Amino acid sequence: MVKLIIGRKGSGKTKKLIDAVKAATEASNGNVVCIEKGPALTYDIPHKTRLVNIENFGVVGYDAFYGFLCGICAGNYDVTDIFVDATLRIGSRDYGELLEFIKKVKPLSEDSNTVVTFTVSCDESELPAEIFDFAERF
């Protein structure tokens, strides 16, 4: 399952993400991963959660990002949840590219039984309507 936390900058997306990470970490019988761009969430995320600063891995663009997510799922079958903050800063602000990325992530999440949640910094009206065929609103 793919979920999107959508809203403009300052609308509380990261707070929702942090709360969801905490809840998933407590409920999960496996591992929870949180991906961020930069070290902003270090003190907000539970220590049991695997916090990954994607800048340390040279990931730029949606193709590299998809490969990175595949590696996480392939490398550890116990991952139950992946949370991603600042999705558009990792991939790009091109909403068409975001749609194609989400189309690829959905089968990955289903095959690996992993819930993947992204924050997307924009108005929902800016996104292609088709994106909700592949992801649900958080």
How would you name each of these model-derived features?
Residues 1-73, 126-130, 135:
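Conserved P-loop
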